Each structure stands twice: as C-alpha cells, then as structure tokens.
Design a protein with these regions (language model features):
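Macrodomain-like recognition of ADP-ribose-binding/processing modules
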Residues: 1-145
Length: 145
C-alpha cells in the first residue's frame, strides 16, 4: 500500500472515531462553538505584550507539529496551521501529506474547519477571489484534540 492510500485510511479512521466516540464528538462541538473567523482587515484590540516574566524562546526542531506541541502538555499551546485557503483540511480526504493534512489526519481539526460557517466566511470567498496569494484572514479554533 502506498503512503497516499495509507493516509486516506488513517483519515477515514479519524472520521469514524470523531463521529462515533461521544467524547470526541462533544469536544468537536465545543471547539466549533469557540471557533472564530478573524478577517485580515479586522482591527485587533491593543495587546499587552509584557504579561510574561520571561521573554519568548524560539526553538527550531525536527519534531512534527503535534509532537512539538505535546511537549508543552497542560499549558495553553497554539499551533499554526499552514492551511489551504480554499479547502478545509487541504487534501486530507485524498491522502495528501502536507502539514495541514497531517494535523487533520490525527485530530478533530478537519471536522471543526469543515462547517457551513467557515465555508461561508473563509473558504468560498477565497475560492471566488481567484488569487493564489489570498489574504491575512484567520480561523481560530480552540481546544483541538
């Protein structure tokens, strides 16, 4: 079996689990309820950037995204999804293997992104723009599992 087929099977298993496991289903509903679209043109409130005693450290490692995030278990961790602006999960349903697809293959992220609200506010406008550069729009999705 090639990698693409294996990726599709893994995603199908994730989909099955997210639909049939009540804890995962509840977690997905909770994440979707807290999910927020932030337009690139939206003005963000002033931020107090001096709230931590120690300065941020930037660490470059060979770890995969969720592997690196797991190191900070129990803390509030944000993961940057280098995402497709036109397809939720990129090509995860077809077995593609870039970063977004990997995130969606092993979590409930795809099922949070693939909602009517996000299609209307994020994916369809980007498709209609026909601009490969897209813009600075953001989807914030809390508490992915």
């Amino acid at each position: 079996m090639d990698r693409k087929e294996m990726n599709k099977i893994i995603f199908q298993n994730t989909e099955y689990m997210c639909k049939t496991d009540s804890a995962l289903s509840d977690a997905t509903k909770k994440s979707v309820s807290g999910q927020r679209f932030i337009a690139g043109s939206e003005k963000l409130p002033g931020l107090n950037l001096n709230i931590y005693k120690n300065k941020a450290r930037i660490v470059v490692s060979r770890k995969r995204t969720y592997e690196a995030a797991a190191y900070y278990k129990g803390q509030h961790v944000a993961v940057h999804n280098f995402a497709s602006a036109v397809n939720p999960g990129g090509g995860v349903v077809y077995g593609a293997g870039a970063q977004e697809e990997c995130l969606c293959r092993c979590s409930n992220l795809y099922f949070c992104l693939n909602t009517p609200d996000m299609w209307g506010m994020f994916y369809m406008p980007h498709r209609a723009a026909h601009d490969p550069i897209h813009n600075d729009d953001i989807i914030y999705t809390p508490d992915i599992v």
